[in-house]
Amino acid sequence: MVSAIVVAGGKGKRMGTVQSKQYLSLNGKPILYYTIKSFLDCKLVDNIILVVPSHEIDYCEKEILEKNSLKVNKIVAGGDERYDSVYNGLIEAKGSDIVLIHDGVRPFVSKETIENAIKYSEEYGAAAPGVMPKDTIKIIDDNRFSIDTPNRSHLISVQTPQAFKFDLIYDCHKKIKNENVNITDDTMVAEYFGNKVYIYPGEYTNIKITTPEDLIIGEYLVNR
């Protein structure tokens, strides 16, 4: 069984909005609508688990799912940190062979990217899409002076869905709760315990909508 965990616990801080960014409108539909529909449209995904803040569960059921005729298998309350939310989703995904973990504000993930996540995680145990940065990347010191320029050919901007054999990522998430480490995504959780993650080619259109500028790009993409 293949399960997709859609993590939709983001706030509107960088977006500058009161409303959580996953509920902002793109062409008359909430961002989260497009994200969920992407997984519903992929026949290889058997199970969809939506993780949202506990106080938003009722809103999400009525305003996102019911109003837009969407169905998920389970809505789960998130935790204080992102990895807590993912772990809550993983508990509901027990029995899965493969689990995909996806940002709720990446609405333009393609069917091909989802299918490749499944394929490569089955082969390698852990996989994620990524794209090469278009800009030169600098490492700066605390005073914002450039101190190094990494070789761009070895740099990747990692996206989601990040896919894993279930037992691998579940065991890692159970253990990471006892570690004092700053975790920003699930590939880091896997890598922290010595697992290799295969990075396959992603798509530049698979953007994470975080800022007002992203919303403008999103409006263009949804109307292509």
Swiss-Prot record:
Site keyed Positions MEP for the nucleophilic attack: positions: R152, K208
Q: What class of enzyme is it?
A: transferase
Annotated positions for site Transition state stabilizer = R14, K21
Q: Which CDD domains match?
A: CDP-ME_synthetase
Keywords assigned: Isoprene biosynthesis, Nucleotidyltransferase, Transferase
What InterPro entries does the record point to?
IspD, IspD/TarI, IspD/TarI_cytidylyltransf_bact, ISPD_synthase_CS, Nucleotide-diphossugar_trans
Family annotation (SUPFAM superfamilies): Nucleotide-diphospho-sugar transferases
Reactions catalysed, semicolon-separated, are: 2-C-methyl-D-erythritol 4-phosphate + CTP + H(+) = 4-CDP-2-C-methyl-D-erythritol + diphosphate
* Biological process annotations from GO: isopentenyl diphosphate biosynthetic process, methylerythritol 4-phosphate pathway
Q: Which family does it belong to?
A: Belongs to the IspD/TarI cytidylyltransferase family. IspD subfamily.
Q: What is this protein called?
A: 2-C-methyl-D-erythritol 4-phosphate cytidylyltransferase
* Organism encoding this protein: Clostridium botulinum (strain Eklund 17B / Type B)
Its lineage reads: Bacteria, Bacillati, Bacillota, Clostridia, Eubacteriales
